[in-house]
Amino acid sequence: MTDGPLIVQSDKTLLLEVDHPRAGACRAAIAPFAELERAPEHVHTYRLTPLGLWNARAAGHDAEQVVDTLLEFSRYSVPHALLVDVAETMARYGRLQLVKDEEHGLVLRSLDPAVLEEVLRSRKSAPLLGTRIAPDAVLVHPSERGNLKQVLLKLGWPAEDLAGYVDGEAHAIDLAEDGWALRPYQSEAVDNFWNGGSGVVVLPCGAGKTLVGAAAMAKARATTLILVTNTVSARQWRDELLKRTSLTEDEIGEYSGARKEIRPVTIATYQVVTTKRKGVYPHLELFDARDWGLILYDEVHLLPAPIFRMTADLQARRRLGLTATLVREDGREGDVFSLIGPKRYDAPWKDIEAQGYIAPADCVEVRVTLPDAERLAYATAEDDEKYRLCSTSLSKSRVVEKLVAQHAGEPTLVIGQYIDQLDDLAARLDAPVIKGETTVKERQRLFDAFRHGEITTLVVSKVANFSIDLPEAKVAIQVSGSFGSRQEEAQRLGRVLRPKGDHGSARFYTVVSRDTKDQDYAAHRQRFLAEQGYAYRIVDADDIDGGVPDADGVLPG
């Protein structure tokens, strides 16, 4: 027995003692391969999963490193069977390889003939395979490249795709490094992606994912299709590319609800690409409109299901996914792995914070007690109404008013899910509100006013969760969300993580109704951030009148 912070159990769960002096080092060491499941105050539970281990393998970690990490931090002896299982699971990645054969074209090759035999006999994979040309090789039709990778992953034999990519139509793109340069982690992310061919780069919000995309484009020097979440995001990508690269306005097209421009660099929204008319996708032609050399997926954790199907046909093109979290609430992380590619780079948020590239954050959960009348209404409500009732309690509005007053003059975002609640808060705070029906032009006007300090408080619905660059937001107050969405929590914290001019820290408040579904969902949402090393302090709404001190005891204002 040693004094390690980790207990490794035979059911593949890892228990991390949060208050242990080496907990931070342990968390950083296990993050590349373990998945956080629960994060209460004192002991966090992680799990080893095949997908987590394969992602780690693809990102350059081997079984020996994983085993050494578990042995180094474990308090008790690690079950031998678990160590063997880790080694065997990681060895499954790459046992099958998709390669380009000069004579036969696309071929599935196996380093282990018995594995190939198993795959050939499987009812799921056999129809996707062609003629066996050698004891260790079988033909694959290029159109089945994506589907085959999905099926092989489900069979437990994730294929390493070494078949290469078409170069696409050449188009000169250079970074315009005029008074700025890529940060070291951005350069490393681009190199890892390029060497791997395709895959996902995971970086915190505010850490410059767009620049990683721009640098990848400069490396590819080819026509590029960029898929983004919404029109505002598309225009921000366009502005950033004009500022950071040699591209001109004529070379960048927007393919959205408003415009249908196809140019050497085309930025399209997920919504338009997945629009269906009479059972067909009329905008599918966009993927064949040019000989794209690179396809970029922004916020890859939000990729709609139809785009997975479209991406299965794009396996011969380089694909780069950008995201702050690989967590998908629909559980389709395996499809991201198979079709976009494995994780190529993942920077822990706290590491980038330590380098000064994102602001430190103080996360506070403010718990309110429902008044008797609301409590009774909640107790007697139908299950599907309960979350809305406790999320929109009037007690929350009073807490938000106090918090905004305490941070008067500081750029503050109030974020929520329910429009009537946000309209009420906007009226109470005398602040503008941005919601789904707000026009793109009006959104941009309000975002610009917020950036320039003309507005200090802005009330926003979930439309502001993604890709909205609000560099000056210093305080975020969350009143309601998409049930227990961890990805949403990460995005919302990201709104305030961009580095502050005064090197100060950001405040992230979550206002939660005590002893309700709201509290349960809040605990679930916080799991991802706990994995990144963010601790939530819990304060009572009755105790905030004099202000909520930060972790060092300093009051706001």
Curated annotation (Swiss-Prot):
Q: Where is this motif: DEAH box?
A: 298-301
Per its UniProt record, the required cofactor names are: Mn(2+); Mg(2+); Ca(2+)
Q: Which domain of life is it from?
A: Bacteria
Chain residue ranges for the region called Required for protein stability or solubility: 1-135
The UniProt record lists the EC number as 5.6.2.4
Domain Helicase C-terminal: start-end pairs: 398-544
Keyword set, alphabetical order? ATP-binding, DNA-binding, Helicase, Hydrolase, Isomerase, Magnesium, Manganese, Nucleotide-binding
What Gene3D superfamilies does the entry give?
P-loop containing nucleotide triphosphate hydrolases (3.40.50.300)
Q: Which residues bind ATP?
A: 203-210
Q: Which reaction does it catalyse?
A: Couples ATP hydrolysis with the unwinding of duplex DNA by translocating in the 3'-5' direction; ATP + H2O = ADP + phosphate + H(+)
Q: Name one GO molecular function term.
A: DNA binding
The Helicase ATP-binding domain covers which part of the protein? 190-344
InterPro entries associated with the record: ATP-dep_DNA_Helicase, ERCC3_RAD25_C, Helicase/UvrB_N, Helicase_ATP-bd, Helicase_C-like, P-loop_NTPase, XPB/Ssl2_N
How the cofactor is bound: the record states: ATPase activity has a small preference for Mn(2+) over Mg(2+) or Ca(2+). Co(2+) and Zn(2+) are inactive.
NCBIfam families referenced in this protein's UniProt entry, alphabetically: repair_heli_XPB
Its biological function? Answer: ATP-dependent 3'-5' DNA helicase, unwinds 3'-overhangs, 3'- flaps, and splayed-arm DNA substrates but not 5'-overhangs or 5'-flap substrates. Requires ATP hydrolysis for activity; the ATPase activity is DNA-dependent and requires a minimum of 4 single-stranded nucleotides (nt) with 6-10 nt providing all necessary interactions for full processive unwinding. The ATPase prefers ATP over CTP or GTP, is almost inactive with TTP.
Subunit field text:
Monomer.
Q: Which family does it belong to?
A: Belongs to the helicase family. RAD25/XPB subfamily.
Q: Tell me the domain comment.
A: Removal of the N-terminus decreases solubility and/or structural integrity of the protein.
Protein name stated in the entry? DNA 3'-5' helicase XPB
The source organism is: Kineococcus radiotolerans (strain ATCC BAA-149 / DSM 14245 / SRS30216)
* Lineage of origin: Bacteria, Bacillati, Actinomycetota, Actinomycetes, Kineosporiales
